[in-house]
Amino acid sequence: MGCDRNCGLIAGAVIGAVLAVFGGILMPVGDMLIEKTIKREVVLEEGTTAFKNWVKTGTTVYRQFWIFDVQNPDDVAKNSSKIKVKQRGPYTYRVRYLAKENITQDPEDHTVSFVQPNGAIFEPSLSVGTEDDNFTVLNLAVAAAPHIYQNSFVQVVLNSLIKKSKSSMFQTRSLKELLWGYKDPFLSLVPYPISTTVGVFYPYNDTVDGVYKVFNGKDNISKVAIIESYKGKRNLSYWPSYCDMINGTDAASFPPFVEKSRTLRFFSSDICRSIYAVFGSEIDLKGIPVYRFVLPANAFASPLQNPDNHCFCTEKVISNNCTSYGVLDIGKCKEGKPVYISLPHFLHASPDVSEPIEGLHPNEDEHRTYLDVEPITGFTLQFAKRLQVNILVKPARKIEALKNLKRPYIVPILWLNETGTIGDEKAEMFKTQVTGKIKLLGMVEMALLGIGVVMFVAFMISYCACKSKNGK
């Protein structure tokens, strides 16, 4: 009887030990299986989970616009006063709803090339008004004229055309005209062939972005989605030195197994440069743990604050010999037009940039850019891209509309908030197929290990106690 009991206790302890060992073994084996599955499914080729969502995003993406309506146009033009602005919006469009086109796999260098069609559909229910709402804004053509044509004689000719067309420093335009283009009366009088259509995003609809060529990750998963070339080149030809390099992905996804210490690099054709985001915090997105990476203030800092930015300063006068910060001159990739990009309301910009403008209220939470990345797959499940478009206008003695200006202005035209969040159905599917399975496996591993250890200890204690009792 005692032997049977002792044997039973030993058997229980052995079973506990086996369960504990099995649970311990399952941890690295399970992690290896998860890693193998993830590596297979994030490859950009037909049949994988990543490819299906990569070709056409399953997330609805909206682009909201706030327009800076100028309240004192005559006072500015006559007296070079501070520009008083009032933001109006949001006006919302649905974007990025078209699938990638001309998708071509290259098995030799393990890349896939494509173009991204552009399109925007107005969403009245998500907007404060209609596309016909009017705004008083800087006259884009008049402001750009002396910047592009600096010869005095040419400016005299342009001045006569500006006066003949009854154009001035400011103009009234509808939302639709301002964003997507309008026939400019001044440019229509220019006696040689030039584009007479002007708009902040003209041309956009029915155009494509690319050609992009990205690594598909089949031979090296650490390179998946990283851009190999853009428009057939590995550099942009806009910036000197390393600032001209195309780095990282397009921010829709990143190589898997993202760590908090990693700097996420990505290229944005909207701002004509590569940029980066750093870890900010952990958040829960519809039950999915994600890492929030944020665009740091350092990204638009002056070379004095961040020496790595020295090659983004290509102009010495407006930038006060490269000491100003928070704005980026992207004129070289906008056909020489004086276009400057910043964060909304000149967030993180130097005081000299925002001082001539009244009515701005920068707010970190409302105006910063962030990416919410699921760390195991590297998929971006939520994002907010926030940018402001500004135009430089300078005094021009030969152009009457600008001759009274006593200083240059970087004039805010609008700011945009492009957002996308994984839908509820997609989130549930993601949890079921990815995070749910990983969580379940982890629970099984810990349960086996925990139960095994408890069984082993309990049965061994009982065995020792029983043996001690029998010995007496």
Swiss-Prot record:
Marked site: Critical for TLR4-TLR6 dimerization and signaling: 463
Main location: membrane
Gene name of the encoded protein: Cd36
Expression by tissue: Expressed in the apical side of lingual taste bud cells of the circumvallate papillae. Highly expressed in the intestine on the luminal surface of enterocytes. In small intestines expression levels follow a steep decreasing gradient from proximal to distal segments. Expressed in macrophages. Cell surface expression detected in lung alveolar macrophages, dendritic macrophages and lung macrophages (at protein level).
Residue ranges, annotated region (Interaction with PTK2, PXN and LYN): 460-472
UniProt protein name: Platelet glycoprotein 4
Induction conditions: Expressed in a circadian manner in the circumvallate papillae, levels being lower during the dark period. Protein levels decrease in presence of lipids.
Covalent cross-link (Glycyl lysine isopeptide (Lys-Gly) (interchain with G-Cter in ubiquitin)), residues: 469, 472
Residues annotated as transmembrane: 8-29, 440-461
Region of interest: Required for interaction with thrombospondins, THBS1 and THBS2: 93-120
Family: Belongs to the CD36 family.
Disulfide bonds: 243-311, 272-333, 313-322
Reaction catalysis annotation: butanoate(out) = butanoate(in); (9Z)-octadecenoate(out) = (9Z)-octadecenoate(in); (9Z,12Z)-octadecadienoate(out) = (9Z,12Z)-octadecadienoate(in); tetradecanoate(out) = tetradecanoate(in)
Subcellular location(s) of the protein: Cell membrane; Apical cell membrane; Membrane raft; Golgi apparatus
Glycan attachment positions: 79, 134, 205, 220, 235, 247, 321, 417
PTM comment text: Palmitoylated by ZDHHC5. Palmitoylation is required for proper localization at the plasma membrane.
Effect of gene knockout: The preference to lipids such linoleic acid is fully abolished in mutant mice as well as the induction of both flux and protein content of pancreatobiliary secretions. Animals with a double knockout of APOE and CD36, fed a Western diet for 12 weeks, exhibit much lower levels of CXCL1, CXCL2 and CCL5 cytokine mRNA expression in the descending aorta and a corresponding decrease in atherosclerotic lesion formation, compared to APOE single knockout mice. Enterocytes from proximal small intestine exhibit reduced uptake of fatty acid and cholesterol.
Species annotation: Mus musculus (Mouse)
Source taxon at top rank: Eukaryota
